[in-house]
């Protein structure tokens, strides 16, 4: 699959050429280049742990959903790799118009900076979901169905969760009633699809709910919701300080829950053109102080800095 030599630097340059262009301009890579990105990134994901152990300083981003020009804005504010270390929390494809550019740039950066750039799996990095919500159709329209299957093979090897400096637990969705020790995550074998129930499903699908105690059924029809008591117990047991997750649109791009023990990040401003939400990126410094950079939904706005919370 990697027979023809492919220049990742050249791919990144071409993907970044549209900076400053009118949003929506496409970058059409060669099919063999995209296949190379999938194959090479997949081999890196498999070599690295399914539960990443990362160090601050790092910038964390939530859902992107094919909003490629907003991804470029995030990098403009946070610094293009390798200027900053990054962790993305999943949901790169579907819903937005440019899932292909979005995932290709992220995979290219993963290949170029494997120890400084990390992407987790979201519930949309799953064939049964992105078959329905736009990515399959985009692949079919711009390339072919076989390429969509190549992406599926790559997504099936993405890491599931990350821990930053042993204190900040990151995933796309949330906690699971089945999760008692980190070893359970480490034991999950890849490649794997996302099952309909169980630990892996919950980590990518569950949601916090301030109005409940314990666990409850989820309106999504998948996984569960969990109350502040669940968050508090989990952090105490694991000797951690914060859960950082994505998966839900929040008006300001970030939203705290359970006395600031959990934060939801969402990084696609003006989501789908239907929500008037901001997008946010969380910067974690060496002392684990968290601060937020906000992408306003209005097009030509500057980021505003929001104060964070000091961690021990």
Curated annotation (Swiss-Prot):
Gene3D superfamilies: 3.60.21.10. Binds 2 manganese ions per subunit. Its EC number is 3.1.3.16. One of its GO terms (biological process) is protein localization to kinetochore. It catalyses: O-phospho-L-seryl-[protein] + H2O = L-seryl-[protein] + phosphate; O-phospho-L-threonyl-[protein] + H2O = L-threonyl-[protein] + phosphate. Belongs to the PPP phosphatase family. PP-1 subfamily. Probably complexed with regulatory or targeting subunits. Component of the cleavage and polyadenylation factor (CPF) complex, which is composed of PTI1, SYC1, SSU72, GLC7, MPE1, REF2, PFS2, PTA1, YSH1/BRR5, SWD2, CFT2/YDH1, YTH1, CFT1/YHH1, FIP1 and PAP1. Component of the APT complex, which is a subcomplex of CPF, and is composed of PTI1, SYC1, SSU72, GLC7, REF2, PTA1 and SWD2. Interacts with BUD14. Interacts with YPI1. Interacts with SCD5 (via KKVRF motif). Present with 14600 molecules/cell in log phase SD medium. This is Serine/threonine-protein phosphatase PP1-2. It comes from Saccharomyces cerevisiae (strain ATCC 204508 / S288c). The lineage of its organism: Eukaryota, Fungi, Dikarya, Ascomycota, Saccharomycotina. The gene is GLC7.
């Amino acid at each position: 699959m990697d027979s023809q030599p492919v220049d990742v630097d050249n791919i990144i340059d071409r993907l970044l050429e549209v900076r400053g262009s009118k949003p929506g301009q496409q970058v059409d890579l060669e099919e063999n280049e995209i296949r190379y990105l999938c194959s090479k990134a997949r081999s890196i994901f498999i070599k690295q742990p399914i539960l990443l152990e990362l160090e601050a300083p790092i910038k964390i981003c939530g859902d992107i959903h094919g909003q490629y020009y907003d991804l470029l804005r995030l990098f403009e504010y946070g610094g293009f790799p390798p200027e900053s270390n990054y962790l993305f929390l999943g949901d790169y494809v579907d819903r937005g118009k440019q899932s292909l550019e979005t995932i290709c740039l992220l995979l290219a950066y993963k290949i170029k900076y494997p120890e400084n750039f990390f992407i987790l799996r979201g519930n949309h990095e799953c064939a049964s979901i992105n078959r329905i919500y736009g990515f399959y159709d985009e692949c079919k329209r711009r390339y072919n169905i076989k390429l969509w299957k190549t992406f599926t093979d790559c997504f099936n090897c993405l890491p599931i969760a990350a821990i930053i400096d042993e204190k900040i637990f990151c995933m796309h969705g949330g906690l699971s009633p089945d999760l008692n020790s980190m070893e359970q995550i480490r034991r999950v074998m890849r490649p794997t699809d996302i099952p309909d129930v169980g630990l892996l499903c919950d980590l990518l699908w569950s949601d916090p709910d301030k109005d409940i105690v314990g666990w409850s059924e989820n309106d999504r029809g998948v996984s569960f919701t969990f109350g502040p008591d669940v968050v508090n117990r989990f952090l105490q047991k694991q000797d951690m300080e914060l859960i950082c997750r994505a998966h839900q649109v929040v008006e300001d791009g970030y939203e705290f829950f359970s006395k600031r023990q959990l934060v939801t990040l969402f990084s696609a401003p003006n989501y789908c053109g239907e929500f008037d939400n901001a997008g946010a990126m969380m910067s974690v410094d060496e002392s684990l102080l968290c601060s937020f950079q906000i992408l306003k939904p209005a097009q030509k706005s500057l980021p505003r800095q929001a104060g964070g919370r000091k961690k021990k």
